Amino acid sequence: MAFLDNPTIILAHIRQSHVTSDDTGMCEMVLIDHDVDLEKIHPPSMPGDSGSEIQGSNGETQGYVYAQSVDITSSWDFGIRRRSNTAQRLERLRKERQNQIKCKNIQWKERNSKQSAQELKSLFEKKSLKEKPPNSGKQSILSVRLEQCPLQLNNPFNEYSKFDGKGHVGTTATKKIDVYLPLHSSQDRLLPMTVVTMASARVQDLIGLICWQYTSEGREPKLNDNVSAYCLHIAEDDGEVDTDFPPLDSNEPIHKFGFSTLALVEKYSSPGLTSKESLFVRINAAHGFSLIQVDNTKVTMKEILLKAVKRRKGSQKISGPQYRLEKQSEPNVAVDLESTLESQSAWEFCLVRENSSRADGVFEEDSQIDIATVQDMLSSHHYKSFKVSMIHRLRFTTDVQLGISGDKVEIDPVTSQKASTKFWIKQKPISIDSDLLCACDLAEEKSPSHAIFKLTYLSNHDYKHLYFESDAATVNEIVLKVNYILESRASTARADYFAQKQRKLNRRTSFSFQKEKKSGQQ
């Protein structure tokens, strides 16, 4: 090991030792940096300093002439040495040698024509094609599974299996629904079938998915192969079908409805099934009436009372005041709850609170309910749209589409290219909940082609009125449909509206009476 303290000698040693062996470029950086610093310390103009330069054989100073190696090219980054011609040639020969190894040379020889027929026959020997015996090996797992699940192959609802969302929970929007099956036996219908569907599916697709899962699980009885033979109804938590509302529209997406409990009901569309008519019992209450559907006349009056109270209180817990049933024709006489409907010989009853009496004339309504009126009342909850004209304050009209169903009334403007140019015709869509509806009255009927009706509803603690006009037949149908809906619902807003209207009428009557009394005294 040698210790040197002369930077010039050290730099010269690095320069000569790493001319061809430095591939990192580190020596170039050392030479450039230290030579610059050394030049600043020992400028070349200073004479007599023998320690800062090395004398060559020709007597000239060589201290900084060879400060940088001639074989290292200075660049922005590290130095890169160019390859010599010999190295490039050796690399080319190596690649050619590797390519020759990959090639195979075959020597061409002339075919010997003196070959016997036996030798030619041995070249293409005839093989015996015998039928192989059937393989009696073990069956594959797929074959075994297909034999165990024959219903999967013969399921007529396989096309709806793509809407099954059980494998997409957490990754895609899904909806879990409990479906009751009234077509089951009396014990199986109490337990719902849980279905997980894609949120993008329609109601028709959900019906097909329910039928597919029903068939895959091997349930009985078998379903009709036609999906259109079924519909979905709103159901209570105990499986009771709510017939006051129409079935869900098959073309609507399922995510539009927030119901978690539904019932799959068969449509009675064939002529043989149309004779199966439902039985309805009318229950009068203080602010309207309800139609309770029963399967037969063997049902007890206690079951009818429970349904009536549940229908009156809705989703609230059945607690608080107790009620009893009375015949419409026999006031203040309670009905025996253990008796059957058949033994009562009546189809109309009154719901009266315990420890109270029914006043005369409180429930005086037409007790004669024909089947046509019942059908009109039930169909009034089905959605139907009408094209009418909405009358504004300045007496100009706007064409709108009036959609009426059992749960709400929708008013959508019908815009046309001609009407869109007028700045005042900018009617916004309006949606009115049925619980906020108060009244629907015929305002004017001039001719069969022109009539006006008024719709009253509650908005922000204030009663608002909307006026519409159309032909007389359409107006009468709308008024009748809305009034059927209002009579079948015990709306608080409607009761308050009539109470306020009655108070105004009484105040006006008393004022006119006092005025007449004063004029008589004079």
Swiss-Prot record:
Signal peptide: none annotated. Keywords: Acetylation, Cell membrane, Cytoplasm, Endoplasmic reticulum, Endosome, Golgi apparatus, Lysosome, Membrane, Mitochondrion, Mitochondrion outer membrane, Nucleus, Phosphoprotein, Stress response. The modification Phosphoserine is found at residues 128, 186, 315, 356, 510. One of its GO terms (molecular function) is phosphatidylinositol-3,4-bisphosphate binding. Phosphorylation at Ser-128 by PKC promotes relocalization to the perinuclear region, where the mTORC2 complex specifically mediates phosphorylation of SGK1. Phosphorylated at Thr-86 by AKT1 or RPS6KB1 in the presence of growth factors; the effect of this phosphorylation is however unclear. According to two studies, phosphorylation at Thr-86 by AKT1 is part of a positive feedback loop that increases mTORC2 activation. According to another study, phosphorylation at Thr-86 and Thr-398 by RPS6KB1 promotes dissociation from the mTORC2 complex, leading to inhibit mTORC2 signaling. Residues 2-267 are annotated as: Interaction with NBN. Residues 139-267 form the CRIM domain. Residues 279-353 are annotated as: SIN1-type RBD. Phosphatidylinositol 3,4,5-trisphosphate (PI(3,4,5)P3) promotes MTOR activation by relieving MAPKAP1/SIN1-mediated inhibition of MTOR that takes place in absence of PI(3,4,5)P3. Component of the mechanistic target of rapamycin complex 2 (mTORC2), which transduces signals from growth factors to pathways involved in proliferation, cytoskeletal organization, lipogenesis and anabolic output. In response to growth factors, mTORC2 phosphorylates and activates AGC protein kinase family members, including AKT (AKT1, AKT2 and AKT3), PKC (PRKCA, PRKCB and PRKCE) and SGK1. In contrast to mTORC1, mTORC2 is nutrient-insensitive. Belongs to the SIN1 family. Component of the mechanistic target of rapamycin complex 2 (mTORC2), consisting in two heterotretramers composed of MTOR, MLST8, RICTOR and MAPKAP1/SIN1. The mTORC2 core complex associates with PRR5/PROTOR1 and/or PRR5L/PROTOR2. Contrary to mTORC1, mTORC2 does not bind to and is not sensitive to FKBP12-rapamycin. Interacts with MAP3K2. Interacts with ATF2. Interacts with MAPK8. Interacts with GTP-bound HRAS and KRAS; inhibiting their activity. Interacts with IFNAR2. This is Target of rapamycin complex 2 subunit MAPKAP1. The gene is MAPKAP1.
